[in-house]
Amino acid sequence: MSNVTTLLDAKSVPEAKAALVCPSRNETYSYKKLRDEMNRIGFGLLSLGVKKGDRVCICLDSSPEYLISYFALWRIGAVAVPTNIIYKGEELLHVINDAGAIAVITDRQGAGVIRSIRKDAPALTHIICCGGACDGTLAWESFPPAPENMRAANCSTADLCHIQYTAGTTGKPKGAMLTHGNWMTALDTERDALRLTPVDTYLGIYPMGHVGLSWGLAVIRAGGTYVMMERFDLEHYLALAEQYEVTILAGMPPVIHSLVHAAPGTEQRLKHARVIISGGGGLLPVVWEGFDKRYHIPVANSYGLSETIVIGSGTTTLPEYPQLTKNYQSVGVAVGYTELKIVDTADPEKELPFGENGEVAIRGPAVAGGYWNLPDATREVFRQDGWFLTGDIGNLDAEGILCITDRKKDMIIMSGWKIYPTEVENVIIRHPAVADVAVFGVPDERKGEFPVAAVVLRPGAALTGAEFEAYCRNHMAGYKVPRNLIIVDSLPRVHGWKLLRRDLRQKFGGSRS
């Protein structure tokens, strides 16, 4: 049987051991309690008529109920469709209708939004509400215990279990179709890449509606303990790392940046950590180098997408690749059974030589089967030979080490020159007045496009256009220098880290002042 939830049936893990800890609610789920809750909710869904292959949306904040919902749906062979409690009605309606969801699991806040759009969601039959029922919903707490003999649905590796809607950085979200086989491969790969064991404790901060959840599931797959945070707060993060003697830290670029600039003595508070994971966006070399020199904790700078359940490559500190720990530009080597290659952006059939920039392509058993209800979009990037075109620009060296340069859609072409925004940002972020930066292209009748920089200044700092231009010209070729400096209070990011250059182009695309 290939049902991914069989990871909770392992006899090698003591049933009383903590699998999931939610410190904000002072709740601990042992492996037995987590399995019992999974079966209870799964059995309740079966009693409502949810069957194998049916799609069910999860609309919750990160919580034990979110994780249990995944497991319960997978247990009965249904398909989890994760969303986020911050979605507005129109965003939720798109996902619910596109997926054809027959039920939604939410809380009292989300129930109000869903009830307001229910009339426009013809397939939606049930709203299950955590925290007590309200009008038109069923209470999560009302489902009775499952029979003792309840077992996982018989699923194959090819059976769909998850539709992960992309963040929509290039338009309307697309649903990546993920299977039990995809998930089992990803969890085993992540477990092996980080050499996870039952003694590991993981501090997770990735939103549970995001495939970054897989790191927490990989720790459970290894028999360890997953300590969850609903949202990042530096002091709380450090306190939990100390209290639970955390060995595996979840990090995103903003988290690692915060740690670089944290108070003296913070190093001691992370003394149990043996690795920190970075994912979900590019980690600037200056930030990585600063973290490395201060903490001496290896950074697993991972690369992947919704379409690959995170897994593509990673700078895991394997003995055979010691150089990864000091290559601050790299996202490492292909992990597990994943294959990587670089192809021509105009002709994906043409593989490029080592060191040359092109589109990153990934092939392997964790790669999604395509996009839900979008055959044309599927054919465009999921090739018949199994290669997935990521839309990211990068290069491979002779040792198989991957460096991501930029997004294909973000590349700026000015008078025939190719400008990679991330490369320019890596220079600008080193300016002492700059806290955050985004470089993007705007149309120009004569040159096609030209680069613009939106900059967030450090508190109390100032930066004039002339100073900015002089700095850039001293550190990069003239054609790469942004033609305009825009000072902003913040940059648009998904989940707090993935940059939405599209929003900047829409807002400032006509500005040259």
Where are these regions (language model features)?
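Gly/Ser/Thr-rich phosphate-binding loop
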Residues: 221, 246-250, 260-326, 339, ...
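Conserved beta-loop-beta connector loops within the AMP-binding
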Residues: 337-361, 380, 398-399, 461-465, ...
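Conserved pre-ATP/AMP-binding loop-to-beta segment of ANL
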Residues: 16-18, 129, 145-165, 172, ...
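Conserved AMP-binding/adenylation subdomain of ANL enzymes
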Residues: 184-201, 208-248, 262
